[in-house]
Amino acid sequence: MIKLYNTCMDFKCLNDVECSHPEKILGPHLEDAYIIRAYIPIARAAFILIDNKKYQMIDNGKVFEYRSDNEINDYKILYIDDSGYEKTIDDPYRFRPEISDYDIYLYGTGRLFEAYKTFGAHLKTIKDVSGCNFVVWAPSALSVSVVGNFNHWTPGMHPMINVNDSGIWALFIPGIKENEVYKFAIKTKNNEIKMKTDPFAFYTEKRPRTGSIVINDDFHWTDNSFKRSENALSIYEMHLGSWKRNNGDYYNYREIADMLIDHLKKTGFNCVEIMPVMEHPLDISWGYQVVNYFAPTSRYGKPDDFKYLVNRLHENNIMVILDFVPAHFPDDDYGLYMFDGTHLYDYEDPRMGRTPDWGTNIFDFGRNGVRSFIASAAVFWIDKYHVDGLRFDAVTSMIYLDFGRKPGEWIPNINGGNINLEAVSLLKEINDYIHNKYYNVITVAEESSTYPGITSESGLNFNYKWNLGWMHDTLDFFHEDPLYRKYRINNLTFSVMYMYSENFILPVSHDEVVYGKGSLYRKMPGNKNEKISNVKLFLSYMFSYPGKKLLFMGNEFAQKNEWNVLSQLSWNDLDDGKYVMELIHDLNNLYKNDFNFYNDKNFSWIDFNDKTNTVISFNRGNAVCIFNFTPVERENYAIGVDYPSRYIEIINTDSKKYNGGNILNESIYACKYPMHGRRYSIEIDLPPLAAVIMEPEDLNGSSGN
């Protein structure tokens, strides 16, 4: 026990909600006697219960006190509130909150990358007493207290301990159980009390309510046998709330699971990328303005429901990637912004700390506590939710200090440059940690600049980078009237110049089908049939081109309208789109199972100079890929090939299987007529606005895959 002496000043800090060391006043103490104190501002009377006997506690300005000549080790407190309600509690201050000095040290040095195991709300049993251990970082706060229904949301009734004056506050509260709603009441140096959500909350109330919820982490996983794909990666990007709706309302994570699995099997994708599930207040932010980085949104259910979704996907050999937003956070008053009355999580200077385009706050990547927080938020989803990868959003905005800013609106780094050295080092550290600890988990950068080494081990060490240059150039080409596409062939050939500079994913993402940009279908010129043909041609080109694949939901069946986050996909478009979906299934199977296509190094041009016919062709290994970008059939079109073999057509987007005109090339024998630098050639009938993919028959009589 601690020896202390009672002074009115000690109690004043409690009544003023400014107590940073309540353990020095409350709980059991040895002074001139054995004294037990409890601060219960909502009580009109309090009693101590010892060996089933009740003793009156003295009210000293809502600090209730009991004195004894004998040491008391086991007791409870009964209080009566102003309404006459009686409640019996264990005294939080006879327990030491659980946080190690080493964790405090690591968090303060920016190297506690699994801080979620310590911070937040954790159900525990201490000295045979069950309760919840709360830990939060708020270094500039005068006091922090836990509030909830258990104390009538009264600030100061459960003041936390500023452990070692580290700015990390902790308190074990007995009796707290699963599903208890809580917040932190933070007294700032401006004499304000802010009611804040727990930055490490693992579950929250459904919007518009903002309370954090205590959960028990006891989900039973059955995905031990799941193996992540190491070769082909075909990603279906989706937004859970607008994929399908249940009579206008959201489906639960569990309800989504089997519907999604069935759809992915029909289309052949082996990976799903889910737009941010981390809790966010605003539906129309799509999830990219996150407040609770450790909580799956309660829009679609509870944390165990989301774990169920991931587990079911793994049971069906489908990988799961989550979008992760480490760059910035919103202004919502209950969240990270001005958390302890200061710019704790963001840069204070708006030239560093404010995004000019999005009106959000940029994380202070140089503050060690923030580094621990962001890194832990990334690792958390891999550790606790078994996800197979993270797609880091807005990496360019993290790297560049002048991102979206005019001259004079940004602060150079210590070398006078425009690189945020703190952000760059943090990204590198997070990637290194993940790759060292988790086998075959992938990280992906959405990065649009020419910053070098995004996917190199000596650079930022991401596994993949979105090839946004390829995406924009290719979509611009397809948007062009076929009559003029011959003047834009460079749009297709330019990306080959840098295709191996990074490990790329070819994305056709949500960003390209919103804000008036139109759906993939609407981007295409021509009448309805020509638009569908162009979509099939585009998808075939994408799946033939080196790089992993990513396609946003709706594009797999050529949805006509652009994406609307407030409604479900236009599933009625499947009447026409089912043929596109059949093609996607076949393209995915080809890509996943044929080494020629999933080995990104297998690429060589056959011909990119036929601007007259607007036809290009290339090899993927020994496969021959030919693309006719005009609505004109090219009969007896000659292509150079490497083998004196019979060539088998494995994809033809004009096939009746895909509702095309059925101009086919079932088998073509190569002749000894050199062409395009090859010793042999074949002549094919090339359908209008179509892709044809052929492979040579091998010695065993099958196509060479």
Curated annotation (Swiss-Prot):
The keyword Glycosyltransferase applies. The gene is glgB. The lineage of its organism: Archaea, Methanobacteriati, Thermoplasmatota, Thermoplasmata, Thermoplasmatales. The active site is at 393 (nucleophile), 446 (proton donor). It comes from Picrophilus torridus (strain ATCC 700027 / DSM 9790 / JCM 10055 / NBRC 100828 / KAW 2/3). GO terms for cellular component: cytosol. GO terms for biological process: glycogen biosynthetic process. Keywords: Carbohydrate metabolism, Glycogen biosynthesis, Glycogen metabolism, Glycosyltransferase, Transferase. Monomer. One of its GO terms (molecular function) is 1,4-alpha-glucan branching enzyme activity. Its EC number is 2.4.1.18. It catalyses: Transfers a segment of a (1->4)-alpha-D-glucan chain to a primary hydroxy group in a similar glucan chain. Pathway: Glycan biosynthesis; glycogen biosynthesis. InterPro entries: A-amylase/branching_C, Branching_enzy, GlgB, GlgB_N, GlgB_N_E_set_prok, Glyco_hydro_13_cat_dom, Glyco_hydro_13_N, Glyco_hydro_b. Belongs to the glycosyl hydrolase 13 family. GlgB subfamily. Catalyzes the formation of the alpha-1,6-glucosidic linkages in glycogen by scission of a 1,4-alpha-linked oligosaccharide from growing alpha-1,4-glucan chains and the subsequent attachment of the oligosaccharide to the alpha-1,6 position. It holds the Pfam family GlgB_N. This is 1,4-alpha-glucan branching enzyme GlgB. The keyword Nucleotide-binding does not apply. NCBIfam families: branching_enzym, PRK05402.1, PRK12313.1.
